[in-house]
């Protein structure tokens, strides 16, 4: 179901995947991408990881904005075909790719978050490597970051 897949680093295995679902988020995707990279580098240095942008065939250069964001962690872009939209389709692609990569854990953050910090990656990812199967955040958030819960 991938219309497009861009894998500049040739990643074929990753224990930890951070996914950023998107649709027309070129203006905002860089910040959560940078924060995810910092979190992975700082808190999971010994674990193979990748940041995947699961996109809905955005027309606003989301792909380029994501891939051009400087990170220490490899990135991968996958997209649905034209006309196939919705976060559910992004998640379907994410689970398919994470399975192909042999991922042991997946962390998902939204593309338009402004309050995300590297610690989010730590707090969402660490329990998954300590016998927890699911982690949901409980936090005070900025009033405009509601899209993480209003998908």
Where are these regions (language model features)?
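Short, well-formed alpha-helical segments that are part of the catalytic scaffolds
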Residues: 2-7, 25-41
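Alpha-helix termini
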Residues: 7-8, 37-47, 70-74, 97-102
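Cell-envelope/extracellular polymer assembly enzymes that use nucleotide-activated donors
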Residues: 15-17, 50
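Conserved acidic residues
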Residues: 49, 104, 133
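A conserved acidic beta->alpha catalytic loop
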Residues: 55-64
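Short, acidic/glycine-rich phosphate-metal binding loop used to engage nucleotide
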Residues: 57, 80-87
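Acceptor/aglycone-binding surface of glycosyltransferases and processive sugar-polymer synthases
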Residues: 83, 89-93, 97-98, 116-151
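Short beta-strand-to-loop acidic/aromatic patch adjacent to the donor-nucleotide binding site
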Residues: 102-114
């Amino acid at each position: 179901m991938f219309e497009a897949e861009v894998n500049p680093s040739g990643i074929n295995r990753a224990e930890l995947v951070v996914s950023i679902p998107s649709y027309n988020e070129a203006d905002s995707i860089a910040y959560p991408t940078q924060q995810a990279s910092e979190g992975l580098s700082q808190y999971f240095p010994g674990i193979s990881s990748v940041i995947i942008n699961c996109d809905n065939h955005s027309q606003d250069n989301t792909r380029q904005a994501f891939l051009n964001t400087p990170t220490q962690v490899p990135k991968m872009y996958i997209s649905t075909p034209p006309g196939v939209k919705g976060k559910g389709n992004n998640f379907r692609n994410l689970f398919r790719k994470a399975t192909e990569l042999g991922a042991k854990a997946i962390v998902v953050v939204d593309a338009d978050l402004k309050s995300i910090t590297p610690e989010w990656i730590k707090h969402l990812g660490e329990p998954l490597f300590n016998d927890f199967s699911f982690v949901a955040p409980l936090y005070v958030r900025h009033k405009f970051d509601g899209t993480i819960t209003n998908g």
